[in-house]
A protein has these predicted regions:
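Terminal low-complexity/charged segments
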Residues: 1-167
């Protein structure tokens, strides 16, 4: 049996627009894009604390490369376990910009943000333990970027370059 969600994305966007009118944009009735990433932490706090939203579960954070736009994005997937609704928020930044960490609001953001930095180079301000999580500290670059050149060797060991399944 499929349960009807208590709040749909249009309702969620109206709540966000009432406080952050110039900072969010509804895209194709599927996700909300935060256009003013400087307001992200305040928006995230509202998502968690607003009685009509109550997003208590950060399911995952994914990062992506915008390609020719020279932007890098983060997609946050939230769930309200008590109100049974879901939301995806996306934020895009350039290489010189950073996003506020939300690890103080959702502990699960800690490692997800570190992975987004390690693989895609997205920086998170005020992260309590901002360092690489998968690659060595001296690894050069961020391997999931479309413009990344895989090195021939790392510390004298050959680095495999078989991209058959993902290029």
């Amino acid at each position: 049996m499929v349960r009807k969600l208590n709040v749909d994305i249009l309702d969620i966007h109206k709540i966000l627009e009432s406080k952050f009118s110039e900072s969010t944009e509804l895209i194709d009735d599927k996700f909300i894009k935060v256009s003013n990433f400087n307001k992200w932490h305040e928006i995230a706090l509202l998502l968690k604390d607003n009685n009509k939203l109550k997003f208590d579960y950060l399911m995952c954070i994914s990062s992506y490369d915008g390609g020719d736009k020279k932007t890098y994005g983060v997609a946050y997937n939230f769930k309200s376990t008590s109100l049974n609704h879901y939301l995806e928020i996306r934020i895009e930044v350039t290489d010189k910009e950073s996003i506020s960490s939300i690890s103080d609001l959702w502990g699960s953001a800690d490692w997800h943000e570190r992975e987004a930095y390690d693989m895609m180079g997205i920086k998170f301000e005020n992260h309590p333990n901002f360092k690489r999580i998968l690659l060595a500290d001296d690894w050069d670059g961020h391997p999931l970027r479309k413009d990344y050149d895989t090195p021939e060797y790392y510390r004298g060991m050959p680095v495999p370059k078989d991209k058959t399944y993902w290029e």
